[in-house]
């Protein structure tokens, strides 16, 4: 072994070592190896603001073995033979810098190589063209990391102290939550209007075709008058227009467009998309998956062109070079594409293969000819003397589209032809059925993960490496939920003319039904309002985008890191210092819903420690108030007295178990449940108001069975042998010890359990600690 190459991921280490041969040994750092300390031993701040934001780093405890192995190998080959091959983005550059620091490698001379795909030619070429660590990229990554840590470190305690149920606040996540909250309020305020849309089914030469009237009616009366006027009317073709058209393929994928398309076409979340893309990249099947470039290399274009010509013929090939619109994009980088365009199957994993197929087809389509179309519009005049007067003549229009050459649609997209009968101007057509149906304007659509990524990109918030993390974080914190909405049924008026008479009917239509949309929780709305009122810059879209631009300037050596950080931190910290004057009682207003007729006490909807809730009675009254959660789908502003009274009927005695214990149904912090003695059983998606005794007993029995499987043994002093998420273990309530792999947990005696507890170093059992922020906790010490 003469050379050591250090990569980020162990998954790609073997592949790269195979390409480089016996003179190279490839090891992995397994991602980041150091992070900013959470707390220093001497109490000094982890980030010294006064000293140009100097940050103190520490090796992550779980990476100590990795570092030991790397140091041993560095010593074996010599520092001059170490190659840093971490990823080609800013995070990768920062990891390379940290490796230099921890492994005592000279930053000025240590060889740094980058590649956007894991192929033999690319790896070999990278070895021939090494550079050194780019400190501008490192500084940009550090600026982001320091800024995000400062915001979290100083703003989160304010949120804990001032916002009921507040968890934390992030610099980039908070504007994303605000976007979702604003969209939700647009939907809530939306007042729809209805109109009547008229469609007709005509017949010519035994072929039916559909046409739409060129005007809509605001009232049922107007629509009815129009349909009745058709009783003596004739329908004559007055014009036939045919226009050629083309449809061009989209550019190859960037990180953003891949997440959008995978969400739309495959139903993948942003996190799942990036996980599959990471695996495909590590396996050498696609190029680097974090990019905002739509550029393809000349070699990639040539390979795609050759493949298209051989498979489909020269008419299907059109060479294209797409121009990246993003100002921050680096054209030296490439779009996401297959490393071998001829490879159809890249993975045995169905999710990875679906994503690969999407990437491959999009890449091929980008180098294929436009689709050619012929669009036909047939205009049909209404000849009759009873037509109501209107500003423009009432006409029906039938539209058809025929693909005359499929081009790129051969591999990506594809439309069905919309055929029309062969007609000539002056031909008379017969109406088979004419309908005026009530339609309603629609409110703005809730964001999907894909459409939110698109909006963030449009606003300049975040970068390719951060979109998936942003969306995952706001859901993890409980500010946003991905949910389905069943929608509501509504009555729709339908007027129908069958050639003889006009009939009226009412049909049921479901509206507002959605799947997989992002919905802000009440806590999300509260945190967005709080930050908008008191920390405007944190949720301001333009400000957040400008910060991203400044990171780009640091990366391009056009701005000093300390200058940028001071520009953000100084006004931000001033707001933190002023936050002590914020009145917590005015954050998240209370609302009296009504009076409970049984107790004559007020029912109040308000925010509590875990989010919105209902309170029966005053906190300063003689009796302690009762509490209940809000009904599903209700908000503090909208919950009714009837809904609230229903919630206070809980807990409800459903019945008894077979051995005579009461079964109580209720709703708690984590949803609906039943309780038998000290045992709690989730009953999602059952309703505690209506769950039957039979169903409750069934769920209770299943829980008992699961608990029995979990408890392997229990001794009189409280020591237990349990089956856990990560395998069998022993616990005494304060200490957990993993059972050795060669030991059967069922054979462990009390003495053996005590021996393992006393001789094994173990982590204490986790207990939730709620920190209470002091008045000065938000201030920089």
Predicted regions and their residues:
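Metal- or metallocofactor-binding catalytic centers and their adjacent structured scaffolds
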Residues: 218-253, 259, 424-430, 437, ...
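Conserved nucleotide-binding/hydrolysis micro-motifs of P-loop NTPases
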Residues: 10-13, 30-36, 88-92, 116-121, ...
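Basic, low-complexity terminal or inter-domain segments flanking catalytic cores
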Residues: 2-3, 15, 74, 132-133, ...
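Short acidic, hydrophobic short linear motifs in intrinsically disordered regions
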Residues: 237-240, 248-262, 287-291, 443-455, ...
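C-terminal or mid-to-C-terminal helical accessory/interaction module adjacent to the motor/catalytic core
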Residues: 118-202, 242-246
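A conserved hydrophobic secondary-structure block that centers on an alpha-helix together
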Residues: 261, 265-269
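Intrinsically disordered, low-complexity regulatory segments
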Residues: 1-146, 154-155, 214, 313, ...
């Amino acid at each position: 072994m003469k050379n050591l190459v250090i990569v980020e991921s162990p998954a790609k280490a073997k592949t790269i070592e195979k390409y480089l041969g016996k003179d190279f040994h490839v090891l992995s750092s397994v991602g980041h190896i150091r992070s900013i300390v959470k707390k220093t031993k001497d109490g000094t701040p982890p980030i010294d603001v006064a000293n140009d934001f100097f940050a103190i780093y520490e090796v992550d405890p779980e990476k100590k073995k990795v570092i030991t192995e790397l140091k041993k190998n560095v010593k074996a080959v010599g520092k001059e033979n170490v190659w840093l091959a971490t990823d080609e983005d800013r995070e990768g550059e920062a990891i390379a810098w940290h490796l230099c620091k921890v492994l005592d490698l000279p930053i000025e001379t240590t060889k740094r190589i980058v590649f956007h795909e894991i192929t033999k030619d690319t790896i070999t070429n990278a070895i021939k063209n090494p550079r050194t660590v780019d400190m501008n990229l490192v500084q940009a990554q550090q600026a982001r990391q320091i800024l995000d840590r400062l915001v979290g470190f100083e703003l989160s305690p304010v949120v804990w102290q001032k916002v009921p149920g507040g968890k934390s606040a992030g610099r980039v996540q908070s504007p994303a939550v605000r976007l979702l909250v604003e969209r939700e309020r647009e939907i809530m305020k939306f007042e729809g209007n209805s109109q009547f849309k008229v469609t007709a089914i005509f017949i010519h030469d035994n072929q039916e075709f559909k046409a739409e009237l060129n005007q809509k009616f605001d009232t049922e009366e107007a629509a009815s008058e129009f349909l009745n006027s058709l009783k003596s009317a004739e329908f004559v073709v007055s014009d036939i227009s045919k226009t050629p058209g083309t449809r061009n393929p989209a550019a190859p994928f960037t990180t953003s467009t891949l997440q959008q398309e995978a969400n739309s076409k495959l139903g993948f979340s942003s996190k799942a998309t990036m996980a599959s893309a990471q695996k495909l990249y590590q396996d050498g099947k696609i190029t680097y998956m974090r990019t905002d470039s739509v550029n393809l290399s000349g070699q990639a274009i040539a390979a795609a062109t050759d493949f298209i010509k051989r498979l489909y013929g020269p008419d299907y090939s059109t060479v294209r070079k797409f121009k990246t619109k993003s100002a921050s994009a680096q054209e030296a980088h490439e779009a996401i594409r297959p490393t071998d365009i001829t490879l159809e199957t890249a993975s045995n994993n169905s999710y990875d293969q679906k994503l690969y197929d999407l990437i491959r087809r999009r890449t091929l389509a980008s180098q294929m000819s436009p689709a050619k179309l012929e669009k036909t519009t047939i205009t049909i005049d209404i000849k009759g003397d009873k037509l109501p007067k209107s500003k423009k003549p009432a006409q029906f229009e039938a539209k058809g589209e025929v693909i005359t050459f499929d081009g790129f649609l051969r591999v990506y997209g594809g439309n069905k032809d919309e055929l029309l009968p062969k007609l000539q101007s002056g031909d008379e057509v017969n109406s088979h059925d004419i309908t005026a149906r009530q339609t309603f304007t629609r409110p703005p659509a809730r964001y999907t993960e894909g459409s939110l990524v698109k909006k963030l990109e449009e606003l300049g918030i975040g970068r390719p490496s951060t979109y998936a993390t942003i969306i995952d974080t706001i859901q993890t914190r409980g500010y946003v939920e991905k949910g389905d909405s069943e929608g509501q049924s509504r009555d729709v008026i339908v007027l129908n003319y069958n050639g003889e008479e006009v009939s009226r009917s009412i049909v049921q239509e479901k509206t507002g039904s959605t799947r997989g949309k992002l919905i802000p929780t009440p806590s999300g709305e509260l945190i967005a309002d709080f930050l908008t009122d008191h920390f405007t810059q944190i949720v301001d879209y333009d400000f957040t985008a400008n910060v991203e631009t400044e990171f780009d300037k640091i990366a391009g050596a056009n701005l000093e890191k300390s200058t940028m950080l001071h520009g953000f931190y100084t006004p931000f910290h001033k707001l933190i210092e002023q936050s002590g004057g914020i009145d917590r009682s005015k954050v998240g207003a209370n609302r009296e819903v009504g009076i409970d007729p049984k107790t004559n006490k007020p029912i109040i909807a308000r925010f509590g420690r875990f989010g919105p809730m209902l309170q029966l009675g005053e906190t300063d009254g003689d009796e302690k108030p009762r509490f209940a959660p809000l009904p599903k789908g209700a908000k503090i502003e909208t919950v009714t007295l009837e809904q609230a009274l229903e919630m206070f009927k809980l807990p409800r005695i459903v019945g008894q178990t077979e051995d005579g214990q009461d079964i109580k149904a209720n709703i708690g912090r984590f949803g609906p449940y039943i309780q038998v003695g000290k045992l709690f059983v989730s009953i999602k998606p059952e309703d505690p108001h209506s769950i039957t005794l039979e169903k409750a007993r069934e769920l209770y029995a299943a829980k008992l069975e699961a608990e029995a499987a979990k408890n392997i043994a229990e001794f009189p002093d409280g020591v237990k042998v349990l089956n856990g998420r990560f395998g069998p273990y022993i616990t005494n309530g304060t200490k957990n010890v993993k059972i050795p792999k060669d030991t059967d947990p069922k054979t462990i005696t009390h003495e053996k359990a005590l021996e393992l507890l006393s001789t094994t170093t173990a982590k204490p059992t986790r207990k939730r600690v709620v920190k209470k922020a002091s008045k000065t906790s938000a201030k920089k010490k």
